[in-house]
Amino acid sequence: MEAERGPERRPAERSSPGQTPEEGAQALAEFAALHGPALRASGVPERYWGRLLHKLEHEVFDAGEVFGIMQVEEVEEEEDEAAREVRKQQPNPGNELCYKVIVTRESGLQAAHPNSIFLIDHAWTCRVEHARQQLQQVPGLLHRMANLMGIEFHGELPSTEAVALVLEEMWKFNQTYQLAHGTAEEKMPVWYIMDEFGSRIQHADVPSFATAPFFYMPQQVAYTLLWPLRDLDTGEEVTRDFAYGETDPLIRKCMLLPWAPTDMLDLSSCTPEPPAEHYQAILEENKEKLPLDINPVVHPHGHIFKVYTDVQQVASSLTHPRFTLTQSEADADILFNFSHFKDYRKLSQERPGVLLNQFPCENLLTVKDCLASIARRAGGPEGPPWLPRTFNLRTELPQFVSYFQQRERWGEDNHWICKPWNLARSLDTHVTKSLHSIIRHRESTPKVVSKYIESPVLFLREDVGKVKFDIRYIVLLRSVRPLRLFVYDVFWLRFSNRAFALNDLDDYEKHFTVMNYDPDVVLKQVHCEEFIPEFEKQYPEFPWTDVQAEIFRAFTELFQVACAKPPPLGLCDYPSSRAMYAVDLMLKWDNGPDGRRVMQPQILEVNFNPDCERACRYHPTFFNDVFSTLFLDQPGGCHVTCLV
């Protein structure tokens, strides 16, 4: 074994030249005002803040004065020379070297010393969807990452194979942060790999150091901060907890699986519906206050409703003579808002007659982890046939790991899709067959993982071949008790831009259908009246009326279970509530009870306040139809079908 010094940039400067004590105190106060909340949230002791500011201002990387990297070659005791030679000749023998970071300074390291905080640089920062492209295009990046990860190449290895190896191994090295401000896109999680020094720090359940990502605003640069949790003597190892913050032993075991492989096959993968306390906690977390019981308000025949809305598509398209727009929220009979109501109690007390476009507790439908939970009422712990098998990574990680390993053992398809609980437009959504990747994605935003549809029903596009497509229906919920549910007769289609295959999992235009938010991507437009005859031509044994009947059966079952229990376990029966949702679904090939191939609808998500731009453009009466059905109880002639 050998030890080498850690990275060195420049000597640590001991003072800020030309700065008076008063100026130094002022600079520290400004630094604390700007960065204090982030530092406190990360647990960085205040005794380090002064020296941290100095190191940030002057880019002082002085870890090399205190630490060294020890390289340990682990040799199998039982292995003879011949076997060792054979292993060395293999194309990629893997990481035979183990690295440790140790304290090399003779005087050791004192946790109480204000200088005992260190900056770690980041070698690579990216968003997951750009990783492959950067490895292929950024000069030197692939070589540096391969070296850092211990990927050795004997002979000429194709770069595509090298890239694939790095993309798999990087989940042992990736760390994540996200910005607190900006657009939805700007707040997407960023993944980074620390430099060679930071990446050599190993795990310990009782670590000697803590680390935290830190974004230094004046320079717009991200670092990782490293500080000791106790005093260390020379020769002691620097370690951190790779599962920091998690105390449950089983979940820790799962989180550490990328570094410490473990067999979870004996654990049940069963995921029953969560208990009532789970839903009560969600209600409290959402700060939603349930309404009091009220009597429905009856308006005189011919009453003209004043509508207050901040939804531009409603304001531009609603022309029905029974509705008039008002700029005064206080005068409105109907509130059709884009943002979520929270205080239904106050509304029910002060303005019980005001109609609104949402139901208390409708997040049970529109948030993906809740959707999966309530769906189990229809299909048991495995879920119903119309919803892909889904696990909440925050609460059901062990069950998911067990299920993944079971499928792996039986040679079954193991492609999965990670989705945030509550984002649309495929933001921060990833298709993968890497268990390590899924486990690590849990550390960014709250996510579910759903079985990726490996055998979707495809649509032949003459220009590109057979592609994935999804279907969007608009459903109108008139009331919870009794359940009254309608579906708009026109549906909308979205298509992938490249022929489908279970490869290139980060190829957005192959695996995703949401193209209408990227100005650089072509949106394939096919209207439903054109789609149906073309679909039946491609699949003559599957009449669209039969396929749609199965889709409507799935919608009916979903809303029945969503409304079956009182709040917060189900949607609240508030007489003044109405709602419009978009249900996105795909079709997959499955086997029916008789063994014949069937098209099984797969509900992907339910969206509150969907984008209705295409609906308004191609069907000018759309919002007149919606308002007549929901608020006038006059669905006749409104292009809707009653489901319940």
UniProtKB/Swiss-Prot annotation:
Primary role: Negatively regulates post-translational modifications of tubulin, including detyrosination of the C-terminus and polyglutamylation of glutamate residues. Also, indirectly promotes histone H4 trimethylation at 'Lys-20' (H4K20me3). Probably by controlling tubulin and/or histone H4 post-translational modifications, plays a role in mitosis and in maintaining chromosome number stability. During RNA virus-mediated infection, acts as a negative regulator of the RIG-I pathway by preventing MAVS binding to TBK1 and IKBKE.
PROSITE patterns: TTL
Keyword Nucleus in record: yes
Family the entry assigns: Belongs to the tubulin--tyrosine ligase family.
InterPro entries cross-referenced by the UniProt entry: TTL/TTLL_fam, TTLL12
Residues where ATP binds: S450, K451, Y452, I453, K468, D470
Subunit architecture: Interacts with MAVS; the interaction prevents MAVS binding to TBK1 and IKBKE. Interacts (via N-terminus) with TBK1 (via protein kinase domain). Interacts (via TTL domain) with IKBKE (via protein kinase domain). Interacts with tubulin alpha. Interacts with histone H3 and histone H4 (when trimethylated at 'Lys-20' (H4K20me3)). Interacts with CBX3.
Localization annotation: Cytoplasm; Midbody; Cytoplasm, Cytoskeleton, Microtubule organizing center, Centrosome; Cytoplasm, Cytoskeleton, Spindle
Gene source species: Homo sapiens (Human)
One function term, GO molecular function aspect: histone H4K20me2 reader activity
TTL domain: residues covered: 300-644
Name recorded for this polypeptide: Tubulin--tyrosine ligase-like protein 12
GO CC annotations, alphabetized: centrosome; cytoplasm; cytosol; midbody; nucleus; plasma membrane; spindle
Effect after changing E605A: Decreases expression of IFNB1 mRNA following infection with Sendai virus
Keyword Nucleotide-binding carried by entry: yes
GO biological process per UniProt: innate immune response; negative regulation of type I interferon-mediated signaling pathway; protein modification process; regulation of mitotic cell cycle
Pfam family, one: TTL
Keywords tagged on the record: ATP-binding, Cytoplasm, Cytoskeleton, Immunity, Innate immunity, Nucleotide-binding, Nucleus
